[in-house]
Amino acid sequence: KLALSGALVRKTGDGYYTGTWTDAYAYFFGATYNLNDQHRFQFYALGAPQRHGQNMYKLNVASLDRSFAESLEDYNADVSEIPECGRDCSGTGSSVSDEAAALLGDQQFEMYTEYKGKRHEDNLINERENFFHKPQVALNHYFDINDKMNLISSAYWSGGMGGGSGTYGSMEWDYSNVQRVVDYDATIFENDSLGASSGILRNSNNRQTTLGLLSKLNYDVSPDLKTQVGIDYRYARIYHVKTIRDLLGGDYYMTSDSEFDSDNGQGGLGDP
């Protein structure tokens, strides 16, 4: 009368390029219960909380492979002056010195529970990180009313909390590879000297809740005529908010673009 099943998966990896690590779980639990010949219930819950670093921006080809760049007929840049860093190159995953890392505080983000603590790697700043958890829970009911009629219903909840990170404010820039990337050492030292951060990392958060009810009645009028009638009801609430993820060496960030800002405009870790 009762059947149970479940699974748990753990995934970690460093990625091919600097800063493209992955850190994820996946889970599933299901149960089926036959009450009697007419009623059967099913329940399941699943989700996959995950974080991963991203490499989103194009880099000069010479910074990845100088010999390949020199072999291109239409490549006109002076490749000899562009540092070659290969797989260590990333437009969004940047190493920082021990001196700069020592000035950093915590990072903050939320995936149903608040995380406030160290970065994924002590000496690496991920400008672009994706983090999200979208669990789903459902309860299904199968009702065989008689030989010609049955009712199938499902009540469900689907959530979602997470987002992505990026820069906000005035950053210090490094142009040594022709295209610009953030100079995190310089940004951290600048923020530390000022107290008020001029450039930070922000979270662009997406938070959603969906409640639904599906119900379908099947009725066989005759061998040649089958009918169906049902309902599909759902309620959804979704909102987006930016919050301070990382002060990058400063004590606070002066904010003035939100009705939720504090009176003095000093935003701290996790504030909108």
Can you say where each PLM-predicted feature lies in the sequence?
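Face-selective signature of the C-terminal outer-membrane beta-barrel domain
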Residues: 132-272
